[in-house]
Amino acid sequence: VTEMDNIMFCAQTHNPQPLHLDEEFCKNTMYGQRIVNSLFTLGLVIGVTVGDTTLGTTLGNLGMTDVRFKNPVFHGDTIRSVTKIQEKRESKSRPDSGIVTFEHFGFNQRNEEIAYCIRTGLMMKRPA
């Protein structure tokens, strides 16, 4: 995660929070430095799994629950993700689709868990 990743995300989402942008302000916080925007972190944790899990098969995200940020992310951190399938079922309203519940875990380079969420998606089914 780069400093520019964080700055650009904050700018694009109109989030001027000093905790993400102001180095002087952050020197006096419990972190001692700027932290990466948590929604960027969550997006990254989910996004890096797409190539291995859902590329070209997602029809839409239906919701997220149990979102937690367990440790801060700092500029220069390296993030990796693990995704588990919690549940899958047929869609009641769309016979060509299924509902899949994913559990996403994000870790930094020290193997500390940095983020977690449960996400439900509307997914394409394989043709019968």
Give, region by region, the residue ranges found by the protein language model.
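Hot-dog-fold acyl-thioester-processing enzymes
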Residues: 1-63, 125-128
